[in-house]
C-alpha cells in the first residue's frame, strides 16, 4: 500500500491556493516572470520559517552495504534534511538520498513531496533542506533562464554547476537517468511503419503523411522543446489534423491501443515498460537533457563534505532502466515509494539492514 500523504496546508501557509505541480510533464522547464515571482514568494516564505510540507524523521535501521564505496559511517552526527518535488520519480529519488545518508550515519528529516514546481529548489537554496535530486535541464532552462539547451549531458551539468554556484548551490556529478521527452509506439505499429528513430518518422511524414498520427499533451503541442521544435529540427510534416491532444495518462493508454501511431512519453516513465511501448531514438539529439543530479546547499556540503562521497556510487547506478522499474512499482503496482527505494538500495548492495 502507498503511504498516506503527510498533512499539508491548503496552500502556501496562509491558506491561499498552492502552486500547482504534477507529474514529470510539469518539471517547470519554462523560464519567465512567473517563475521569478514564484521563486521570490517561496524564498520569503521559507526564510520566514513557513514550511510547505511537514517533515518527519527517517527511522530505518540501515548501514553501508558492500557496494557503498566508502569506509565507516562518515556522516555520523550529521543532521540532514532531504526534499523533492511531488511526482513519483522525485519522491523515490528523495527517499534514495535520505536512506543513503541514514546508512552513512546521519539523522535524516524527510521533507520530500513539496508542492509546486520550484519549492524543493528554494528549500535547498534557503537551507531549509540540505539536498535534493534535480534535473540538469531544469536548472539550465528554468532556474537559470537559458533558452538553448546544451546537447552534451556532461557539458550541460558543467555549465549548470558553474553558474549555479552564485546561488549557493553545488551540483554533484549527474546520473545517466535522463527524464526527457520521446516518441513511442506499440510493437504492432513499429512493425507496420518500420520506424526506429525520429528521422525515420520524418521520412515517413513525407512519404505517407497520413501514417504519422500523434497523441500528445496540450503543453507538448505548443512548446519550442516539444512538437513544433521537433518538427522543425527533423523536417517533419505533420498536419494539425494528425495531432490529438489529451492528458498525459491518456496519451499512454491511447498509444498502447494504437489510437495514434505515435505518442509523447517521458523516457523514465514506468508505463513504458508496463505497456510494452517502444521508444524511438532521438538521433539528432533535439530534446534537452534532464539528467538527475544531487543539488546540495553549499554551506551544508562544506559542513558535511562526505555527502558527496556517499551519494556518488548510487548516482552512478541510476539510469533510465532503473528509473522505469522504480516508477512502475509505485505508479503501476501501487507500492510505497520509501519501500521501493529501500528495496533497490538493498538489492544493489548500497545499504544493508542492521
Predicted regions and their residues:
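Ligand-binding "clamshell"
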Residues: 143-172, 259, 271-284
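A bilobed periplasmic-binding-protein/Venus flytrap-type ligand-binding module shared by bacterial periplasmic
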Residues: 181-191, 291-304
